[in-house]
């Protein structure tokens, strides 16, 4: 399965432990396209419609016009995780390279 950095997919993130983000929700693929081509796993950040989360460090606002979702979203960059590509459900949309770059830069700040 070929996926691209910046793609948004619907995914079931269960099971979870503790404070991990779970449930059936959109995720943003942040893994680079070279790795996406060769690996069976993909690095993602979950999205949430809880706009209060935008005030936390390690988040990034994505408008519904950009995401293709029915609601504005917050990328929970601090909840980064690797999942098997078989978890990926329906493709939703793709964000701009500028937004992808901003998400990656926010991740670098967390590291």
Regions found by a protein language model. Give the residues of each.
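C-terminal terminal-subdomain/extension
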Residues: 1, 66-111
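Compact nucleic-acid interaction/catalytic patches
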Residues: 22-24, 29-65
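Short, charged beta-turn/beta-strand-edge "cap" motif at the junction between a beta-strand
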Residues: 14-18
């Amino acid at each position: 399965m070929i996926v691209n950095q910046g793609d948004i997919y619907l995914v079931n993130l269960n099971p979870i432990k503790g404070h991990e983000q779970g449930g059936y929700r959109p995720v943003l693929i942040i893994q680079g396209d070279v790795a996406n081509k060769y690996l069976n796993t993909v690095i993602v950040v979950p999205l949430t419609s809880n706009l209060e989360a935008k005030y936390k460090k390690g988040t990034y606002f994505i408008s519904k016009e950009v995401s293709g979702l029915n609601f504005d979203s917050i990328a929970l960059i601090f909840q980064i995780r690797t999942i098997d590509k078989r978890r990926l459900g329906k493709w939703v949309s793709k964000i701009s390279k500028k937004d992808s770059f901003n998400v990656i830069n926010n991740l670098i700040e967390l590291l």
